[in-house]
């Protein structure tokens, strides 16, 4: 039985585990993997908006809009959204130079 399924009980005023194979390398590896999984899961739940926004938008950034008036930004967004090929309804990629 691994440490992951054992129940810790008070033994002689100390907390211990009733298992003889706690030094088994497989048990140690399973415990490390379990702890890492728990840490990663907690971080994912805490920062999922930041993480997935970074993957979704951060890796493929568009042209810089710094110094461009808001009206021109809105016009560019509308052009990007309406850039559809009428023949087969596939999106057309517009690259500005």
UniProtKB/Swiss-Prot annotation:
Biased composition annotated in UniProt, kind: Basic and acidic residues: 71-80
Site positions (Essential for channel activity, possibly by being protonated during channel activation, and by forming the channel gate and the selective filter): 37
One Gene Ontology term, aspect cellular component: host cell plasma membrane
InterPro entries, per database record: Flu_M2
Keywords: Disulfide bond, Glycoprotein, Host cell membrane, Host membrane, Host-virus interaction, Hydrogen ion transport, Inhibition of host autophagy by virus, Ion channel, Ion transport, Lipoprotein, Membrane, Palmitate, Phosphoprotein, Signal-anchor, Transmembrane, Transmembrane helix, Transport, Viral ion channel, Virion
Regulation: The M2 protein from most influenza A strains is inhibited by amantadine and rimantadine, resulting in viral uncoating incapacity. Emergence of amantadine-resistant variants is usually rapid.
Species name: Influenza A virus (strain A/USA:Huston/AA/1945 H1N1)
Domain comment (free text): Cytoplasmic tail plays an important role in virion assembly and morphogenesis.
Function recorded in the entry: Forms a proton-selective ion channel that is necessary for the efficient release of the viral genome during virus entry. After attaching to the cell surface, the virion enters the cell by endocytosis. Acidification of the endosome triggers M2 ion channel activity.
Lineage, uppermost ranks: Viruses, Riboviria, Orthornavirae, Negarnaviricota, Polyploviricotina
Protein encoded by which gene: M
Sugar attachment sites: 20
Membrane topology (Virion surface): 1-22
Family: Belongs to the influenza viruses matrix protein M2 family.
Intravirion side: 44-97
Keyword flag Transmembrane: yes
Transmembrane segments: 23-43
Name listed for the protein in its UniProt record: Matrix protein 2
Site (Seems to be involved in pH gating): 41
Positions of region (Disordered): 59-85
UniProt subunit comment: Homotetramer; composed of two disulfide-linked dimers held together by non-covalent interactions. May interact with matrix protein 1.
């Amino acid at each position: 039985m691994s440490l992951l399924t054992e129940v810790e009980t008070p033994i002689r005023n100390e907390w211990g585990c009733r298992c003889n194979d706690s030094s088994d390398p497989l048990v140690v590896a399973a415990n490390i993997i379990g702890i890492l999984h728990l840490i990663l899961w907690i971080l994912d739940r805490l920062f999922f908006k930041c993480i997935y926004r970074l993957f979704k938008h951060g890796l493929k950034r568009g042209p810089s809009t710094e110094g461009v008036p808001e009206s021109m930004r809105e016009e560019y967004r509308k052009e990007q959204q309406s850039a559809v090929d009428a023949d087969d309804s596939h999106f057309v990629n517009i690259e500005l130079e």
